[in-house]
């Protein structure tokens, strides 16, 4: 969701069919000094049975009192709703932005990735939260690919039953169904995974259709059956960096031009996964490496310089 109002609207965001949320703002002397959400994803509770409620959209000045007050408000809202722990930030849940950035502030924000103020991690810990998990973002910019991965790619390309085909934007309903099936299979059992529901995938496809570059988004098929996917997107943040957040009236047209004609040099590798049935087969043991090589080759050939 690129429109924050729509993202937080129960009428427009399919999340609210599976969850509920409340939004908090903090004020001091009539000045806005912070914000935070609290939310419950009932699908997460059904899958993981871990009693976790979430907080998210956490942003404050460097002020421990404000941070404590916001996080305490989120916890107080969650407590009577039969959850035993608070985890976050999730904005709004695990299929969207997750975590607080604690390293890498020298790089500009990447689309659909958390980007926090440098002090926010320390504020959360000072307010009493403890680290749940490290999440790593990898930056790749070297066209000299590892020989072992290239060999895997070469072997996969020789397999007559394997096809790596671009996403077909003219048949997005079909492609959306395929992506949902692969995602729910390939990510099942992973940390904080929750199945993507049809309405959520449809909404995501609507949001992303205008920026998808089919040259760097592809599906792996084995004997005509979807086996894996790699969805890499042009970095929208790079395209709108000088628009000061104003897409209307002319900013949106500028962004689309920069994405489609004068495309960015950076990309976001949003999803890469392989269905379990193919991960278990020795013959396709190199498919994952091959898909990384394929994505890199496609990206560099199109003029992109780096990916996260």
Q: Where do the language-model regions lie?
A:
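Acyl-donor binding region in acyl/amide transferases
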Residues: 47-128, 133, 243-308
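Conserved beta-strand positions that form and line the central face of beta-propeller blades
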Residues: 54, 163, 219
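Short beta-strand segments
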Residues: 87, 139, 219-221, 231, ...
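Short, solvent-exposed loop/turn segments at secondary-structure junctions
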Residues: 92-94, 143-145, 235-237
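Acyltransferase donor/substrate-recognition loop-hinge adjacent to the catalytic core
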Residues: 114-192, 216
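Short flexible/disordered coil segments
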Residues: 141-163, 192-200, 255-260, 286-294, ...
């Amino acid at each position: 969701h690129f429109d924050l109002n729509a993202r937080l609207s129960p009428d427009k965001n399919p999340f609210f069919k599976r969850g509920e949320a409340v939004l908090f703002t903090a004020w001091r002397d009539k000045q806005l000094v912070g914000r935070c959400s609290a939310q419950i994803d009932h699908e997460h509770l059904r899958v993981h049975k871990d009693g976790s409620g979430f907080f998210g959209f956490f942003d404050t000045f460097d002020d421990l009192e404000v941070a404590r007050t916001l996080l305490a408000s989120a916890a107080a809202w969650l407590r009577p709703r039969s959850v035993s722990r608070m985890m976050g930030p999730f904005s709004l849940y695990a299929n969207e932005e997750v975590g607080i950035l604690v390293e890498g502030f020298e790089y500009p924000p990447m689309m659909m990735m958390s980007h926090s103020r440098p002090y926010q991690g320390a504020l959360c810990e000072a307010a009493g939260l403890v680290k749940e998990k490290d999440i790593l973002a990898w930056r790749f910019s070297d066209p000299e690919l590892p020989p072992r991965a290239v060999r895997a790619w070469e072997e996969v390309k020789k397999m007559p039953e394997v096809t790596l085909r671009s996403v077909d934007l003219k048949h997005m309903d079909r492609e959306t169904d395929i992506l949902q099936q692969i995602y729910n299979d390939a990510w099942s059992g992973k940390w904080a995974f929750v199945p993507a529901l049809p309405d959520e995938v449809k909404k995501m496809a609507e949001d992303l259709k205008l920026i998808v570059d089919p040259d760097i988004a592809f599906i792996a098929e084995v004997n005509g059956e979807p086996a894996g996917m790699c969805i890499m997107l042009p970095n929208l943040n790079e395209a709108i960096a000088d628009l000061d957040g104003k897409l209307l009236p002319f900013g949106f047209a500028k962004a689309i031009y920069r994405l489609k004609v004068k495309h960015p040099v950076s990309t976001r590798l949003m999803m890469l996964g392989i269905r379990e049935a193919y991960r278990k087969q020795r013959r396709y043991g190199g498919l994952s490496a091959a898909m990384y090589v394929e994505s890199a080759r496609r990206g560099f050939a199109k003029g992109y310089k780096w990916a996260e």
